[in-house]
Amino acid sequence: MTIEGDGKEYELLEKWAKDFDCKGHYSCEIGVRQGYGSKLIMDNVKNNYMHVGVDPYGELKYQHHDRTFTEGWPEFFRGSFAADYTDQMRDTMLKDMYEYRNQGKFTLANMTDTMFMCHPAWNEKTYAFVYLDGPHMTKDVLTEAVWFANRSAPHTRIVIDDTDKMETSVIAHVLTYFDFKTIEMGDTKICLEKK
């Protein structure tokens, strides 16, 4: 089993998750892809009830980040493109995550972030470690961050990926209203922690 990642600065995600005590609450990743971020979190945090991976797969067309523009496409699809997030990728990831699933450490919510946030099964949980690596538009990440902030445990950490593709300062500022502060930034990742 070789679970790979396609991003940068995974060493920061590992550092921020290392020995972080979830105190019996959930951890979550929006945008699982091949599962490397989720694996790093599960291998490093302590005392999480379960890790939830959220990803719809299925080659959906959507705008991935604020500054995407695809010339020549109809207005409806401008800024959108189908990524290689196929159902086959999902099936491979689930096989690779078999040990974690078998031990009750991982479950996949095979749906969009919007569906996840509206789903009653996930709406009333408390989350202690969150990794936002799905849609990278400011408005989407802001919506996710506020949703998780409203369901956060004391000292929850929210890690945001691909910060160079969105207005991260806006998101960090809004999270101050939920008592989150930035504890460290890399070139493409930021970690915020609830006071």
Which positions does each model-derived feature cover?
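S-adenosylmethionine/decaboxylated-SAM
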Residues: 3-195
